[in-house]
């Protein structure tokens, strides 16, 4: 009986301490997500001349649409709009703020549970800061991984990023349809903790975020998912 009582007390203390460390619903990881515009437009049947990786989003690992009454207001980020248009463009509607509105409502309102991200300006500003800090364009170029008709191994891409930042990224591709032998590089995720320190992107049991990219098959191909180590990677060049 004493043992049972002790076990109950111990469990209660453990749960309380865990809740104090990570309050229920609080995120523990941010996923900085960059996508390759050429691959996106292959999936969405659009045309783009962006020749560099652009921001897709900054996503907490738990929660979506945490405060739907907190509406996006572009005037609050007016000073960083030129940078947003350049590095976080809406590839489908370049002159529209719809994409930023969507990202704020779905992910920004959840990121805002942290004091360091508790405003539109803090959230979008931090995403831009991290985008420049973890510069995929420079890292891949430095390792001779450039958009072209040649193929790379997934290990080439992973090693380039891991050697630069010391953590393993999550790399996603458009997979070929039946009989296809080449996957298309589409999206790369780099993760940080609540203090914006790098951490691995391995998915944990508490993660509830999901990929925002469409998963509609294109030309017999599957949607975007984690790249396959056994298959060559195609990094498509800008289409003239």
From Swiss-Prot:
Membrane-crossing residue ranges in chain numbering: none
Glycosylated residues: list them. Answer: 67, 73
What Pfam families has UniProt attached to this entry? Ribonuclease_T2
Q: One GO MF term, please?
A: RNA binding
* Active site residues of this protein: 56, 103, 107
Q: Which residues form the signal peptide?
A: 1-19
- Expression sites (tissue/organ): Ubiquitous.
Location relative to the cell: Lysosome lumen; Endoplasmic reticulum lumen; Secreted
Disulphide connectivity of cysteines: 41-46, 66-110, 173-227, 191-201
This protein's UniProt keywords? Disulfide bond, Endonuclease, Endoplasmic reticulum, Glycoprotein, Hydrolase, Lyase, Lysosome, Nuclease, Secreted, Signal
Family that this chain belongs to? Belongs to the RNase T2 family.
- Descriptive protein name: Ribonuclease T2
Protein source organism = Danio rerio
């Amino acid at each position: 009986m004493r043992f049972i009582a002790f076990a109950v007390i111990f469990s209660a203390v453990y749960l309380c301490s865990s809740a104090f460390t990570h309050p229920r619903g609080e995120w523990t990881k941010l996923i900085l997500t960059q996508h390759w515009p050429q691959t996106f437009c292959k999936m969405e049947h659009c045309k783009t001349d962006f020749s560099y990786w652009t921001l897709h989003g900054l996503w907490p690992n738990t929660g979506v649409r945490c405060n739907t009454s907190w509406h996006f207001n572009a005037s609050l980020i007016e000073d960083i709009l030129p940078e947003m248009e350049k590095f976080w463009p809406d590839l489908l509607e370049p002159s529209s703020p719809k994409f930023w509105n969507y990202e704020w409502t779905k992910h920004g309102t959840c990121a805002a549970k942290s004091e360091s991200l508790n405003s539109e300006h803090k959230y979008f500003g931090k995403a831009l800061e991290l985008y420049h800090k973890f510069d995929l364009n420079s890292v891949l170029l430095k390792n001779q991984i450039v958009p072209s008709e040649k193929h790379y191994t997934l290990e080439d891409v992973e090693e380039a990023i891991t050697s630069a930042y010391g953590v393993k990224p999550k790399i996603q591709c458009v997979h070929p349809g039946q009989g296809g032998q080449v996957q298309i590089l589409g999206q790369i995720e780099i993760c940080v903790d609540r203090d914006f320190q790098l951490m691995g992107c391995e998915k944990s049991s508490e993660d509830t975020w999901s990929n925002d990219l469409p998963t509609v098959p294109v030309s017999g191909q599957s949607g975007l998912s984690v790249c396959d180590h056994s298959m060559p990677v195609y990094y498509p060049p800008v289409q003239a």
